[in-house]
Amino acid sequence: IKNGNLWIIPDLNRASILRRAHGWYGDMNYKFNGLKKSDRDYQTVQKVKKLITNPQIELIFNLHDGSGFYSPQRESYQRNPNRWGQSCVIDQAELDGARFGHLQLLSEKAADQINQHVLHQEHRFHVKNTHTASSDKVMQKALTYYALRTGKPAIGLEASKKLPTHQRVYYL
């Protein structure tokens, strides 16, 4: 960031972070579409939605822990296309009309930058495009897809849960 502001929301789901689990009341990342008011995370999700739609916000990075190690090709049980760790996740390649709408390009640059400083070659990042609108119904409930639907570009950055905490923090 060369100018402007960086807003950070720390510990959005503290209980989940401390337990290294998806969420005490369900995975909060998948509560951004169709959430009932009776859900215990409803108020928190509404606050995040309000932040996302703030006119000053031009790009969202959703920092996450992911399972295993994402790889475009299957290499092993822990390193394959069905895993999420060590990836830049996008719902689509482009968001037309947005200042930072070149999601594929931004994610590739981010992965390249991270990969220049990996602690071990097996920690390399890759871009994972979920093609959410056309093929991933579960991801249509995600924070990043909510952001896209409001005209805000969003990228998920996933560090592998297989890594110790200090390394996950290093990568994110």
How does the language model describe each region?
Residues I1-L172:
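Structured catalytic-domain cores with a bias toward divalent-metal coordination
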